[in-house]
From Swiss-Prot:
Belongs to the glycosyl hydrolase 13 family. GO terms for molecular function: glycogen debranching enzyme activity; hydrolase activity, hydrolyzing O-glycosyl compounds. It comes from Yersinia enterocolitica serotype O:8 / biotype 1B (strain NCTC 13174 / 8081). The keyword Glycoprotein does not apply. The record marks D445 as: Transition state stabilizer. It catalyses: Hydrolysis of (1->6)-alpha-D-glucosidic linkages to branches with degrees of polymerization of three or four glucose residues in limit dextrin. Its EC number is 3.2.1.196. Removes maltotriose and maltotetraose chains that are attached by 1,6-alpha-linkage to the limit dextrin main chain, generating a debranched limit dextrin. Pfam families: Alpha-amylase, CBM_48, GlgX_C. Signal peptide: none annotated. This is Glycogen debranching enzyme. SUPFAM superfamilies: (Trans)glycosidases (SSF51445), E set domains (SSF81296), Glycosyl hydrolase domain (SSF51011). Pathway: Glycan degradation; glycogen degradation. InterPro entries: GlgX_C, GlgX_Isoamylase_N_E_set, Glyco_hydro_13_cat_dom, Glyco_hydro_13_N, Glyco_hydro_b, Glycogen_debranch_bac, Glycogen_debranch_GlgX, Glycoside_hydrolase_SF.
Length: 662
C-alpha cells in the first residue's frame, strides 16, 4: 500500500531527493488536497496530502522516482460569488510542473462549471505532470552579459526562424536544436545580433475556439505550465528531452556570444474566462490566483478572459521562483513580460509594487535583462515610461513616430528628435538610461516591415474572425498599390523607405529590436495578427530572402557599434559632442525650424564624426553638409568610393550616413 509521510513545505512543486519525492501545493481556501499518481496503464491512485503548513499542503512519497506522473484533486467550496470554484472531479496540474505528458484537447469534461459544478471526471483527458530530475553538464557556460549600450535584440519564433532554413537538417528544423545549428548561429553572428528574444517556449495550449477551426496558437501566449519547456519545438530525438535540447541551444548561443531572452506570460493563464477549462489555478484556489470583481467574476484586464493576481504573496512567489528556475536551469539571460502592466497591479498599477521590489532585491534576477510590454487593457493600463529602474520597455510611441515621419509625413520635427534620442521625454527621469527605450518599427504582432510598405489595410480573413482581429491603426503606406504586386516605380519608393526605416531604427539612441525576417523582406501577405498561422505565412522563407537587404542591415548594425553616442548608454546633453541637429544648409536648427511643423529634411551629427542625412520628402533634394569633407560610407556607398563631398544630393525618402574625412 502506497502511503505518504508529511514531508516538507519547501521547496514548492515536486522534487526528487534521491530516495523519494516531496510534493507541495499552495491553496489558502482548500479543505482537502489529494495527490493523484498514475502508473503506466493510466491507473490512478489518490492519496490525501497528509500535512498542511500555513497555506502549503505537502507530503513525501518514499521510493518515488523521476518520471512519475501525477496531478491533484482539490476539494473546497463551489461558490462563484465568493470566488471559489473547487471541483474534485477535475484533475489539476501542479503550477510548478516541469513537464506535462500531453497537450489539451477541446473536451467538455475539462469544464469546471459556471454557476454549478460540472461532475464529469476529467482525468482521462487532462494532462498529467511529470516529475523531472535532469542533471546537465554546462561545461563552464557563462552568460555573455552584453552591455545594454551594445545590445541589438532580434525577436524570433523558434519554428518560424528555423523551419525552412535549407542548411539545417530536416529533422532539426523548427526546433530548439535548429537554433543551435551552426548555420543559424553563424547567420545571427554575421548579422550582428547580440540578443535573441524568443517568443514563448513555456508549455502552451491551443484555445478551444482555435481547435474547432483547425488552427493553433502559433505564437504561444496561451501558457498553461510556465515552468515546463514546450515540447512542440523539440526534435524528439531519442534520449534528448525538450529541456535538454533547449539547454543545448542556450549553451551553443552563449558560446557564440549571443544572449537569450524569453518572452514570458504571467498576465493570464490558459484557463481563459469562466467558460474555459479547469486545469490548474481555477481549481486550486481561484480566489487567490485571479483578480475578481466583488461579484466573483473575472476581472479581464488582459483580453484573455482572466488576470493573474500577482500581488498575492504566494502567487508572486510562484512567478519569482519560475524566473529563477529559468535562470538556474536554462541559463536564460533575461525576460520580456507580455502585458507587463499586470506585474505592478494591486489592482491599480504601482511602480513600487511588491513584485518589482522583489525583482530588484533578488541577487539572481537583478542582473538579468528585464523588458516590459508596458500596457494591458485594464483601467490605467497604458504605462509606457512608468516602470521602475531596472526595466526596459517596448516603446510603441517610437514605433508610431517613425512610421508617421517616413510614411505619413505628419510628425513634428521636435517629436522625431525626442524619439530618435531614446524618447527622452518618457525615460529621462528616476536614473533611467537611454537603453530603457526598446525601439522598434515592427514586432511579432502587427505588419512586418515589408507589409508596412505594401498594405494600407489588414488582410486577416484566414484567422477565422472575419477580419475583425488585428489593429486598424497601422500607419502604413502602400505607395499607391495594395499588395506585393506593383510597378517598378512603386517598388523603388518602398525599398527606399524600407532602408530608411531600418537606418533610423539602428542609428537611434536606445535599444533597437529587429523583428526576424524584416532584414529578408519577409511578408505575411498583409496579415497583421498571424498568431494562429503555423505555416509558410509566418515561417521565414530563406530561399527568397532579399540578400542585399540582409547585407545592408548587417552593415548598419556594425556601424552602430562604432558610434560612441549610440553605445555609451548615457543621455545626450547640449554641448557634449554626442549630437548636433542641423538643417539642410548644415547649420544648427533654429528655434523657428523646430517650431515650424513637419520639417522633413535634416542632418544629425553623431559623436562629431558621423553624419546622418535625412530627406523624408517626396522630392529629390540638395543638402549642404557641415564645414569639412564628408565621405559616404557603407552600406550607403561601396567601400572603395572615397570621393569627399560638401553637398549631398538625395533622392526622395532616403537617408544616408557619411563620416568626416580628416
Amino acid at each position: 500500500m502506497t502511503t505518504l509521510t508529511s514531508g516538507s513545505p519547501t521547496p514548492m512543486g515536486a522534487h526528487f531527493d534521491g530516495v523519494g519525492i516531496n510534493f507541495t501545493l499552495f491553496s489558502a481556501h482548500a479543505e482537502q488536497v489529494e495527490l493523484c499518481l498514475f502508473d503506466d496503464n493510466n491507473q490512478e491512485l489518490r492519496i490525501p496530502l497528509p500535512a498542511r503548513s500555513g497555506d502549503i499542503w505537502h507530503g513525501y512519497l518514499p521510493g518515488g522516482k523521476p518520471g512519475q506522473r501525477y496531478g491533484y484533486r482539490v476539494s473546497g467550496p463551489f461558490n462563484p460569488q465568493q470566488g471559489h470554484r473547487f471541483n474534485p472531479h477535475k484533475l489539476l496540474i501542479d503550477p510548478y510542473a516541469r513537464a506535462l505528458d500531453r497537450k489539451v484537447g477541446d473536451d467538455p469534461s475539462l469544464q469546471g462549471g459556471v454557476s454549478q459544478p460540472d461532475y464529469r471526471d476529467s482525468a482521462a483527458v487532462a494532462p498529467k505532470c511529470i516529475v523531472v530530475h535532469e542533471e546537465y553538464d554546462w561545461q563552464g557556460d557563462r552568460r555573455p552579459t552584453i552591455p545594454w549600450g551594445n545590445t541589438v535584440i532580434y525577436e524570433a519564433h523558434v519554428r518560424g526562424l528555423t523551419q525552412l532554413h535549407p542548411d539545417i537538417p530536416a529533422d532539426l528544423r523548427g526546433t530548439y536544436a535548429g537554433l543551435a545549428h551552426p548555420a543559424m548561429i553563424q547567420y545571427l553572428q554575421k548579422l550582428g545580433i547580440t540578443t535573441l528574444e524568443l517568443l514563448p517556449v513555456q508549455f502552451h495550449i491551443d484555445e478551444p475556439r482555435l481547435q474547432k477551426m483547425g488552427l493553433s496558437n502559433y505564437w504561444g501566449y496561451n501558457v498553461l505550465a510556465p515552468y515546463a519547456v514546450d515540447p512542440d519545438y523539440a526534435s524528439g530525438r531519442e534520449g534528448i528531452s525538450p529541456l535538454r535540447e533547449l539547454r543545448d541551444a542556450v549553451k551553443a548561443l552563449h558560446q557564440a556570444g549571443i544572449e537569450v531572452i524569453l518572452d514570458v506570460v504571467f498576465n493570464h493563464s490558459a484557463e481563459l474566462d469562466v467558460f474555459g477549462p479547469t486545469l490548474c489555478q481555477r481549481g486550486i484556489d481561484n480566489a487567490s490566483y485571479y483578480w475578481l470583481t466583488s461579484e466573483g467574476e473575472y476581472d479581464n484586464m488582459t483580453g484573455c478572459g482572466n488576470t493573474l493576481r500577482l500581488s498575492q504573496p504566494y502567487v508572486m512567489q510562484w512567478v519569482l521562483d519560475c524566473l529563477r528556475y529559468w535562470v538556474d536551469s536554462c541559463h536564460i539571460d533575461g525576460f520580456r513580460f507580455d502585458l507587463g502592466t499586470v506585474l505592478g497591479r494591486s489592482p491599480a498599477f504601482d511602480q513600487h509594487a511588491p513584485l518589482f521590489a522583489a525583482l530588484a532585491a533578488d541577487k539572481q534576477l537583478c542582473n538579468c535583462k528585464m523588458i516590459a510590454e508596458p500596457w494591458d487593457i485594464g483601467l490605467g493600463g497604458y504605462q509606457l515610461g512608468n516602470f521602475p529602474t531596472g526595466f526596459s520597455e517596448w516603446n510603441d510611441q517610437y514605433r508610431d513616430a517613425m512610421r508617421r515621419f517616413w510614411l505619413r509625413g505628419d510628425l513634428p520635427l521636435g517629436q522625431f528628435a525626442q524619439h530618435f534620442a531614446a524618447s527622452s521625454n518618457l525615460f529621462k527621469h528616476r536614473e533611467r538610461l537611454p537603453s530603457a527605450s526598446i525601439n522598434q518599427i515592427t514586432a511579432h504582432d502587427g505588419f512586418t516591415l515589408q507589409d508596412l510598405l505594401c498594405f494600407n489595410q489588414k488582410h486577416n480573413q484566414i484567422n477565422g474572425e472575419e477580419n475583425r482581429d488585428g489593429s486598424d491603426n497601422n500607419l502604413s503606406n502602400n505607395f499607391g498599390s495594395e499588395g506585393l504586386v506593383a510597378d517598378d516605380a512603386i517598388w523603388q519608393r518602398r525599398k527606399a523607405c524600407q532602408r530608411a526605416l531600418l537606418t533610423t531604427l539602428l542609428l537611434s539612441q536606445g535599444t533597437p529590436m529587429l523583428l526576424a525576417g524584416d532584414e529578408h523582406g519577409h511578408s505575411q501577405q498583409g496579415n497583421n495578427n498571424a498568431y494562429c498561422q503555423n505555416n509558410i505565412l509566418t515561417w521565414l522563407d530563406w530561399g527568397s530572402a532579399d540578400r542585399e537587404l540582409t547585407a545592408f542591415t548587417a552593415e548598419l548594425i556594425r556601424l552602430r557599434q562604432q558610434i560612441p553616442a549610440l553605445i555609451q548608454d548615457s543621455w545626450w546633453e547640449d554641448g557634449d559632442g554626442n549630437v548636433q541637429w542641423l538643417d539642410s544648409q548644415g547649420e544648427a536648427l533654429s528655434d523657428g525650424a523646430w517650431e515650424q511643423g513637419c520639417q522633413k529634411q535634416l542632418q544629425i551629427r553623431l559623436s562629431q564624426r558621423w553624419l546622418v542625412v535625412i530627406n523624408a520628402t517626396d522630392q529629390a533634394c540638395e543638402m549642404h553638409l557641415p564645414v569639412g569633407e564628408w565621405v559616404v560610407i557603407p552600406p550607403f556607398e561601396p567601400s572603395e568610393h572615397t570621393e569627399p563631398l560638401t553637398v549631398w544630393n538625395g533622392s526622395a525618402h532616403t537617408v544616408c550616413v557619411l563620416t568626416q574625412k580628416f
